From Swiss-Prot:
Belongs to the class-I aminoacyl-tRNA synthetase family. IleS type 1 subfamily. It is an enzyme of class 6 (ligase). Gene3D superfamilies: 1.10.730.20, HUPs, Ile-tRNA synthetase CP2 domain-like, Valyl/Leucyl/Isoleucyl-tRNA synthetase, editing domain. The keyword Transmembrane helix does not apply. One of its GO terms (biological process) is isoleucyl-tRNA aminoacylation. This is Isoleucine--tRNA ligase. Transmembrane segments: none annotated. IleRS has two distinct active sites: one for aminoacylation and one for editing. The misactivated valine is translocated from the active site to the editing site, which sterically excludes the correctly activated isoleucine. The single editing site contains two valyl binding pockets, one specific for each substrate (Val-AMP or Val-tRNA(Ile)). A motif ('HIGH' region) lies at residues 57-67. It is found in: Cytoplasm. It catalyses: tRNA(Ile) + L-isoleucine + ATP = L-isoleucyl-tRNA(Ile) + AMP + diphosphate. Zn(2+) binds at residues 888, 891, 908, 911. It comes from Listeria welshimeri serovar 6b (strain ATCC 35897 / DSM 20650 / CCUG 15529 / CIP 8149 / NCTC 11857 / SLCC 5334 / V8). Monomer.
Length: 921
């Protein structure tokens, strides 16, 4: 007889290697074929809804690790909710209008000027949809479960129709208006930009000090006195209409080299050296309020520049007197309106000077900086020029500087409902908590929202103009356009004449001849995505508004979180979301932003081909995503190592329950040994902790909890000593079936707990566990937290034992290093204990030699009895010696009773007994 044939060794079809890049697509094809997404929705019919609303990624370019981070977090949440008693449909979306798509089309060599706007827009739509298809494939390969056949896409007619309704409702409430005021203008995009489309970068600029001569001092200043201003935008001097001083600041008149100058008193010490005023004497001090309406002359144009009082003039920098060009700045515009100044902005859409700036016509504004400075020097008005580096607004798409430029634009008035917005922010639950402060401050401080764009690819502003120039936005026109867009798409606006866009028989008092024109501007893309609560949540029967969760990157406080809040509060009076969760950015291993120029980009598609989607997903679960996260080949290697441990744990569990039938072989909880109960209690604790962590969206905690359970509780303890039972004992022995009961429970529980994070691997485990025809793991619910008898008492006892076991392990390790023993199975452990530890061991049930994975064990009361050579710790001393006896050929334990059965001279008594009873015919 071959004794090895009597061992019950593990058997499983679950492979050691995941081979994820090849296996995952097979599971995905199966899920698609079986309509798994639909089955999950059916299973959860009638359950309480939990709606995570997808913030639409922009349909341009390859997926990056930020996309993978974002979509995986969402998928983990939706999968968790779907297994936790909720109905959680997930409708993915795409943002498809805007400049990058226009630019991409232009790069293909399309001659835009040689085709109609409608034709150009068709090309944009085709391009956007190919991008959507490419990204959809990438997201599906990542294992994201959703309604991929019916996503929401902002260019679809049904979406655009609802967006028009949002605009119409806001207009009806008086929130939409047209006005000329300075807006962020991007010469590189030839369009106005919203605050959300601005990013700040360092820029080197000319900083100049300029003297404006007083022509009418109102009895306060002598004629010819110079008021000194400071600016970092010399190109705006041709648009200067005034100077602003603070009414509550003191200003001094100083005399230097026969000239008089006015600056803020508080800034004089800085300016003495900077402007060469070291020897200047103070002639008089005046209050800013006294300087109001004094008249100065523009340095090189024959026009006045009025001195005004404004709070935005401060003594923090410069001279305390602010150059004011109402056409090129927010504060300048407001004070210019107050003092009835001309709103002059002498630039065209490309940032080139018009004939309203004599001497600079046809010059690009940035080029004009040098010319203006030279002109000021020529007329003797330039006191000083230097270069500074400062934070300056840039177009987030083109990365080029933007300017403030007064143009006629359409706005959404924030002032009209700002208090409602702030109240709504307070009513939302924010994670991280600082998100509330961030958005609250943004809403509190923001100006009106410029919603018009001078571009082609977007949703047209549904506005008509009468013959007298009056803008027409009525319920009748809005409803008509909404239905036209629903039927034909928004391109109909550019394909048809005005008369074919208006309702039949439409008349208006401002058009006695029945003539109308239409607006040619489109809406800001943030209005597109910001309308999704109406176009998706409100429009789809399976979804609800407000959503339970909006979850995006932290850049969306100024973007989608903001625009969605604005449109939703405007038309419904409440926020479109109950909870908002934000994540950081994906950086490289050294914490740098990923960029092609640095050569440090890591693309999810490439990682999935090499390692598999489940590794990317496990990486997402491993990081503290609320801050910026790091990813690199080295980090993914570490994650792969954890994956390997989890997989090996599952393989061991599966291999050792191959002959276990849960229906007939399960040992009831009360009939388990204490150590088995202890493991089920630990497993139950894991269920509670993991479910709590899922609920709090703390996936990195789950990663550590499960990794720790697999490594410490299972691999290093329970599964390790189990081999002496499940391989060696008779198939149906109570101890073996008890351990298999725990293994089975652990396999089922871990598979369910990991399913939202590792959908492919857990499906593979589940198939192996349940067998052919198994219903998908993703149609199961998460395990319940159980009430287990005596759990506190058992846990306290066995936790204390585990601490002592740690000391025994250290002693064995020491003995191995000292070459006292080879494998631990050759050892005898003599444990010297104090009274407390003795009481503990007396109360424990178990074969301690087996639990310590040694051949012999002796317990001795009295620490004082331990020899000098013993390994000592606070409660115990451990003496390691070589076990006496022979090694049993079958179980490899050193026993004194090897050969007790003469028919089996190489077996110990236990093994001989098993062989005789179960394997001898």
């Amino acid at each position: 007889m071959e004794y090895k044939d009597t061992l019950l060794m593990p058997k499983t079809d679950f492979p050691m290697r995941g081979n994820l890049p090849n296996k995952e697509p097979e599971w995905q094809a199966k899920w698609e074929e079986e309509k798994l997404y639909e089955k999950i929705q059916e299973k959860n019919t009638g359950r309480k809804a939990y709606i995570l609303h997808d913030g639409p990624p922009y349909a341009n370019g390859e997926l990056h690790m930020g996309h993978a981070l974002n979509k995986t977090i969402k998928d983990i949440i939706v999968r968790y909710k779907s297994m936790a008693g909720f109905s959680s449909p997930y409708v993915p979306g795409w943002d498809t209008h805007g400049l990058p798509i226009e630019t991409a089309i232009a790069k293909k060599g399309v001659k835009r000027k040689e085709m109609s706007i409608a034709e150009f827009r068709k090309l944009c739509a085709e391009y956007a949809m190919t991008q959507v298809d490419g990204q959809r494939t990438g997201f599906k390969r990542l294992g994201i479960n959703g309604d991929w056949e019916n996503p929401y896409i902002t260019l679809l007619p049904e979406y655009e129709a609802e967006q028009i309704k949002v605009f119409g409702e806001m207009a009806k409430k008086g929130y939409i208006y047209k006005g000329k005021k300075p807006v962020y203008w991007s010469p590189s995009s030839e369009s106005a930009l919203a605050e959300a489309e601005i990013e700040y970068q360092d820029k080197k600029s000319a900083s100049i000090f300029v003297a404006f001569k007083v022509t009418d001092g109102k009895g306060v200043l002598d004629e010819g006195t110079n008021i000194v201003i400071w600016t970092t935008t010399p190109w705006t001097i041709p648009a200067n209409m005034g100077i602003t001083v603070n009414p509550d600041l003191d200003y001094v008149v100083i005399e230097s080299a026969g000239e008089k100058y006015v600056v803020a008193e508080a800034l004089l010490p800085n300016l003495r050296e900077k402007l060469g005023f070291e020897d200047a004497t103070v002639v008089k001090t005046v209050r800013g309020s006294e300087l109001d309406r004094i008249v100065t002359k523009h340095p090189f144009y024959d026009r006045d520049s009025l001195v005004m009082n404004g709070e935005h003039a401060t003594a923090e920098a410069g001279t305390g007197a602010v150059h004011t060009a109402p056409g090129h700045g927010e504060d300048d515009f407001l004070i210019g309106k107050k003092y009835d100044l001309e709103i002059l902005a002498p630039l065209d859409d490309r940032g080139v000077f018009t004939d309203e700036a004599p001497g600079f016509e046809g010059v690009f504004y940035d080029t004009a900086n040098k010319m203006v400075t030279e002109k000021l020097e020529e007329v003797g008005a330039l006191l000083k020029m230097e270069f500074i580096t400062h934070s300056y607004p840039h177009d987030w798409r083109t990365k080029k500087p933007v300017i403030f430029r007064a143009t006629a634009q359409w706005f959404a008035s924030i002032d009209a409902f700002r208090d409602d917005l702030l109240k709504a922010v307070k009513g939302v639950n924010w994670t991280p908590a600082w998100g509330e402060t961030r958005l609250f401050n943004m809403v509190r401080d923001r100006g009106d929202w410029v919603i018009s764009r001078q571009r082609a690819w977007g949703v047209p502003l549904p506005i008509f103009y009468a013959e007298n120039g009056e803008a027409i936005i009525t319920d009748e026109t809005i409803n008509h356009i909404s239905e036209l867009f629903r039927e034909h798409g928004s391109n109909v606006w550019f394909e048809r004449d005005v008369k074919d866009l208006l309702p039949d028989g439409f008349t208006h008092p401002g058009s006695p001849n029945g003539e109308f024109t239409k607006e040619t501007d489109i809406m800001d893309v943030w209005f597109d995505s910001g309308s999704s609560h109406q176009a998706v949540l409100n429009a789809r029967p399976e979804l609800t508004r407000p959503a339970d969760l909006y979850m995006e990157g932290s850049d969306q406080y100024r973007g989608w979180f903001n625009s969605s809040l604005t449109t939703a509060v405007a038309i419904t009076g409440e926020a479109p979301y109950r909870n908002v969760l934000s994540h950081g950015f994906a950086l490289d291993g050294e914490g740098r932003k990923m960029s092609k120029s640095l050569g440090n980009t890591l693309l999810p598609g490439k990682v999935i081909k090499q390692l598999g989607a489940d590794i990317v997903r496990l990486w997402v679960a491993s990081v503290d995503y609320q801050a910026d996260v790091r990813v690199s080949d080295e980090i993914l290697k570490q994650v792969s190592e954890v994956y390997r441990k989890i997989r090996n744990t599952m393989r061991f569990l599966l291999g050792n329950i191959n002959d276990f039938n849960p229906t007939t072989n399960t040992v009831s909880y009360e009939n388990l040994r204490e150590v088995d109960k202890y493991m089920l209690i630990k497993l139950n604790d894991l269920v509670k902790n993991v479910k709590d962590s899922y609920e709090a969206f703390e996936f990195s905690t789950i990663y550590h909890q499960i990794n720790n359970f697999c490594t410490v509780e299972l691999s290093q303890f329970y599964m390790d000593f189990a081999k002496d039972v499940v391989y060696i004992e008779a198939a149906d022995s109570n101890d073996r079936r008890a351990m298999q009961t725990v293994f089975y429970e652990a396999a089922v529980t871990l598979t369910k707990l990991l399913a939202p994070i590792l959908p492919h691997t857990t499906e593979e485990v589940w198939n192996s566990l349940i067998g052919e025809g198994a219903e998908s793991i993703h149609l199961q619910d998460l395990p319940d937290v159980k009430v287990l008898a005596d759990s506190e008492e058992i846990t306290a006892k066995w936790d204390a034992f585990m601490q002592i076991r740690d000391n025994v392990q250290k002693a064995l390790e020491f003995a191995r290093n000292e070459k006292l023993i080879g494998k631990s199975m050759l050892a005898k452990v003599t444990l010297y204990v104090d009274g407390e530890a003795k009481t503990l061991f007396d109360s424990l049930e178990g074969d301690f030699a087996q639990l310590f994975i040694v051949s012999d064990f002796e317990l001795v009361e009295g620490l004082e009895n331990a020899p000098e050579s013993a390994f000592k710790s606070n409660q115990v001393a451990v003496q390691i010696t070589v076990a006496e006896g022979e090694t049993c050929e079958r179980c490899r334990v050193v026993k004194k009773d090897v050969g007790v059965d003469p028919k089996h001279p190489t077996l110990c008594g236990r093994c001989a007994d098993i062989v005789v009873k179960h394997y001898e015919a």
